[in-house]
Amino acid sequence: MATTTLPNTKQQAAQFANSVADRAKENIDAAKEQLQKALDKLGKTGKKLTLYIPKNYKKGNGLTALIKAAQKLGIEVYHEGKDGPALTNGILNTGKKLLGLTERGLTLFAPELDKWIQGNKHLSNSVGSTGNLTKAIDKVQSVLGTLQAFLNTAFSGMDLDALIKARQNGKNVTDVQLAKASLNLINELIGTISSITNNVDTFSKQLNKLGEALGQVKHFGSFGDKLKNLPKLGNLGKGLGALSGVLSAISAALLLANKDADTATKAAAAAELTNKVLGNIGKAITQYLIAQRAAAGLSTTGPVAGLIASVVSLAISPLSFLGIAKQFDRARMLEEYSKRFKKFGYNGDSLLGQFYKNTGIADAAITTINTVLSAIAAGVGAASAGSLVGAPIGLLVSAITSLISGILDASKQAVFEHIANQLADKIKAWENKYGKNYFENGYDARHSAFLEDSLKLFNELREKYKTENILSITQQGWDQRIGELAGITRNGDRIQSGKAYVDYLKKGEELAKHSDKFTKQILDPIKGNIDLSGIKGSTTLTFLNPLLTAGKEERKTRQSGKYEFITELKVKGRTDWKVKGVPNSNGVYDFSNLIQHAVTRDNKVLEARLIANLGAKDDYVFVGSGSTIVNAGDGYDVVDYSKGRTGALTIDGRNATKAGQYKVERDLSGTQVLQETVSKQETKRGKVTDLLEYRNYKLDYYYTNKGFKAHDELNSVEEIIGSTLRDKFYGSKFNDVFHGHDGDDLIYGYDGDDRLYGDNGNDEIHGGQGNDKLYGGAGNDRLFGEYGNNYLDGGEGDDHLEGGNGSDILRGGSGNDKLFGNQGDDLLDGGEGDDQLAGGEGNDIYVYRKEYGHHTITEHSGDKDKLSLANINLKDVSFERNGNDLLLKTNNRTAVTFKGWFSKPNSSAGLDEYQRKLLEYAPEKDRARLKRQFELQRGKVDKSLNNKVEEIIGKDGERITSQDIDNLFDKSGNKKTISPQELAGLIKNKGKSSSLMSSSRSSSMLTQKSGLSNDISRIISATSGFGSSGKALSASPLQTNNNFNSYANSLATTA
């Protein structure tokens, strides 16, 4: 079997036209054997065709053309009166039809034929003109030749001459009914097909093409020659436009009247229309089969006739039209979709809709014709199965319908190619006129529509980041419709994977004019440069959707199969993105949508590093997923990894030689990151499939045995915000500001005065050397101040806080917390929840408020420890002894428990519970030192070591000492409680005022309150070495820098 390759380039189009006949052979071969058997059994006949002109029939150019055309074709012309008497046109009652049976054989009746021709305007206009007589003769000759060939084929199995002779001799021949039904069938077929085409010329041309194709097949030369003899019809390689016109006319009926009908409605209407069109044919087929049954002497009534009719109707299936209806639906949808972009100068969606409409027309026409053929074949097949017709007739009908279907299928591809070529010509004409790539213009139109909808979005970004300008780089990615049009028109090597645009919004009003020129000034997507050095005013740079890696695309089309082509993509990529920041204004740079990884065909990962050289003002940088170098310059600069897809961080400043210098390693294994990939779009043009490769992206995981990492270099960066994973921070010898963000983070400040934020997650934070501020945030955190005077804030959750060796402030926040002051004079504020507090060495201050939960205070050293009841009067509290513990109660609940208040330090007891806890939670490097310190304390009882808080102060400055409390309990021996009244009397006797409610305060109270204020101020002063001077960019989402200052002010007010 010959192999034919369809064209994918216009240079191959001419060769393709000559190969259509070969493809027709392939479809015909399947029916070849059956048809040969049928012809062998039927034998040859001696039929002839006569054109009958009745006496006194009007004359004119039309009749002249009929006569001359018939003579050219060898058709006998019989003039009534001139050539003999009137013919007996009543044989078989076939008179007054286009085709009948007379004593001279098959007869075309001139009045009916002339009337039929006159009904076709295209033909009748030519026939009726004297000046076009020669042309008219040719046209009529086409018609008569077509009918002659059609009749010769249809009656190849009938000896009509013998039938006529027998009928004239009065013999009762049962084949008479068969012949009559056959003529009725042929008349209906001719009428139906001509009414569908509405153009007898093109109808003749199609039969001529059928004959030419058959003429190239062995054993079909005789049949093919008859059809090829039609004059001036051209060869098979031409006339695709005419064929398209024929199919357009046929499909007009299938489109139906209601253009707004949905798919289901159209499918149903198509079935109804088909039944109407084929109704007479189905009736004629049924009559023909019943006549065959009568000829065999069998019954023609009842179930048999119904069976045949039902088989014929079942062959006409509405399902065959459903797919076509969907094509028209899509064509209508594309036309509607195109309206949005036509105003921006792009008509490609409409062109694509035209392709689906025109190819749908072809499919509709061919489906209609095949439905007719299927109905005929089904009816004959049903009769043949019931022994109603002879096997030769069944074989002949089957073979002929198969041949016609095969040739129609072969010609359909040629029609599709022709339609695609017409669209390609329109695209080329547009490009010649405007000097621009048509498909790039499509991307431009898509982006213009996007901008029309996005002004509000840009204003929202400007408000969010508090900058004057918004500069957005938008990647218009691969568009399936634009790609499909490129593939169908064989322009797959001329389309890009998309186009990147720069849009500039200043003060919420102006989008940059001459956007193409502006884009080129800012962005070079081939070299990988982004330059904002010419922008004035504070600016946000953002990427609204993922930007493809920098590089140049190259495409080449090759054939990959008989009907398959592939347009392969090669990218000459760059290894870096280089960004120049806004020089003299604040900038926000969001690189989280910048694609920095590309996956090759062999599954290797290529990385495009980002190098950002920023300006002299305050900058805020959101990092993407790939390796990044940030040279932040002067100003207060923040690098933020919190937008995700950055992997778990290890931030290391231990080897820094300058402030703000960090190395960052990121583990991307198991992290979803943006990856550039090569995707394929399949486009179909009939049997031909084109695969177009294009760059795409996906958000996916990297799983590798060795791990996949990114490496960053940060220079002149004042603040770093971590990722959503478990990060590790190692500070420098300079002042560091770290935010853990989400995840269970590990943060070490090391040297310098650091601000360390755990944020969300169960974090562990170590201040190291220097006066540090540690913020746990949400989660169950562990905070260690270590060296220096530190501020520790546990935040939400059940936290563990240790102050270290300086004067520290410890705030538990909400949750059930544990606070250990360790060495130095510390301030411990447990906050809400049931907390445990131990001041450790030094003179410590505890803070309690009435909204707090149950606090437990363990105190072992210092002789000037204080408890501040910040918003509670002493007159509202009572004390209760519970074993060796002292309970402070207010509002009938235990507010504070003083552990071991009534016990004395025991030198033989070894390490007490407090000391054991300290060792348990202390950093490993401090444990040996603390243990030796505790051991030195054993064996001696220092009066300065006790388990008491020496002074308790109410909100108005009223006070009571530990000695006062002990005295009240001692007077009664086994006394268990001290009432508010007893406390009131004690306080009254200690001061000069007559009442706790007096507006004047005793000098003693004022002195004590002043002492508390001084102590608090001293601790605040010690821990305020860093924090108030540090600032964060206004765009920072983590505004926690003022926590310490707010709390310090609150403490001062309380004191």
Swiss-Prot record:
It is found in: Cell outer membrane; Secreted. Residues 993-1006 have a biased composition (Low complexity). GO terms for cellular component: cell outer membrane; extracellular region. GO terms for biological process: killing of cells of another organism. Changing residue 687 to R: Loss of cytotoxicity. Keywords: Calcium, Cell outer membrane, Coiled coil, Cytolysis, Hemolysis, Membrane, Repeat, Secreted, Toxin, Virulence. GO terms for molecular function: calcium ion binding; channel activity; toxin activity. Residues 795-815, 990-1009 are annotated as: Disordered. Disruption phenotype: Mutation completely abolishes the beta-hemolytic activity of A.actinomycetemcomitans. Induction: Levels of toxin expression vary greatly among strains. Highly leukotoxic strains (JP2-type strains) produce more LtxA protein and ltx mRNA than minimally leukotoxic strains (652-type strains). Variations are probably due to different types of promoters. Expression is not affected by iron. Hemolysin-type calcium-binding repeats lie at residues 721-738, 739-756, 757-774, 775-792, 793-810, 811-828, 829-846. Pfam families: HemolysinCabind, RTX. It is a peripheral membrane protein. Residues 11-49 form a coiled coil. Acylated at Lys-562 and Lys-687 by LtxC. This modification is required for full activity. Isolated methyl esters contain palmitoyl and palmitolyl fatty acyl groups with smaller quantities of myristic and stearic fatty acids. SUPFAM superfamilies: beta-Roll. Its main location: membrane. Changing residue 504 to P: Decreases cytotoxicity. Residues 334-340, 502-506 are annotated as: Cholesterol recognition/amino acid consensus (CRAC) region. The keyword Disulfide bond does not apply. Belongs to the RTX prokaryotic toxin (TC 1.C.11) family. PANTHER family: S-LAYER PROTEIN. The Gly-rich region is probably involved in binding calcium, which is required for target cell-binding or cytolytic activity. Virulence factor that plays an important role in immune evasion. Lyses human lymphocytes and monocytes. Binds to the LFA-1 integrin on the surface of the host cell and to cholesterol-containing membranes, which probably results in large LtxA-LFA-1 clusters in lipid rafts. Also shows beta-hemolytic activity on certain types of growth media. This is Leukotoxin. It comes from Aggregatibacter actinomycetemcomitans (Actinobacillus actinomycetemcomitans). The gene is ltxA.
